């Protein structure tokens, strides 16, 4: 799966989704993860709505997007493109997030991750027996 990280340096998630100048892109599976590059956001004049839509289009093909903050309209535009937005609220090293994701993928992924990856979430409970 492809993951985008809002980052000023490619080392940590440290930018707001709508204010970052670049997103660092990683490809990963259960065992490996590699940075495959970055995409830069072109500045310019225009409506905020247009800028959000341009960012969402730029990240098509990603499964997840990490940022420190993201507004509701921006998150909705990502979700409409089947991209799950995730917030860190504090600066977090990208490698730490990758390792957490690997752990989740090798275990029982939480429902939001299973859905984002197109997997059917496994049951986490046993149905009650009928009396």
Language-model regions, residue ranges each:
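Non-catalytic interface/targeting segments
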Residues: 1-54, 61, 86, 90-131
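Mid-chain, well-packed structural core segment of small domains
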Residues: 58-91
């Amino acid at each position: 799966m492809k993951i985008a990280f809002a980052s000023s340096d490619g080392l940590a998630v440290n930018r707001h989704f709508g204010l970052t100048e670049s997103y660092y892109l990683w490809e990963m599976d259960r065992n490996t993860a590699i940075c495959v590059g970055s995409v830069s956001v072109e500045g310019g004049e225009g409506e905020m709505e247009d800028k959000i839509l341009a960012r969402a289009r730029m990240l098509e093909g990603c499964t997840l997007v990490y940022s420190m903050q993201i507004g509701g309209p921006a998150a909705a535009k990502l979700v409409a493109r089947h991209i799950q937005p995730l917030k860190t609220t504090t600066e977090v090293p990208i490698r730490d997030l990758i390792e957490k994701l690997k752990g989740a993928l090798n275990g029982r992924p939480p429902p939001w991750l299973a859905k984002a990856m197109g997997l059917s979430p496994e049951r986490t409970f046993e149905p009650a027996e009928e009396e």
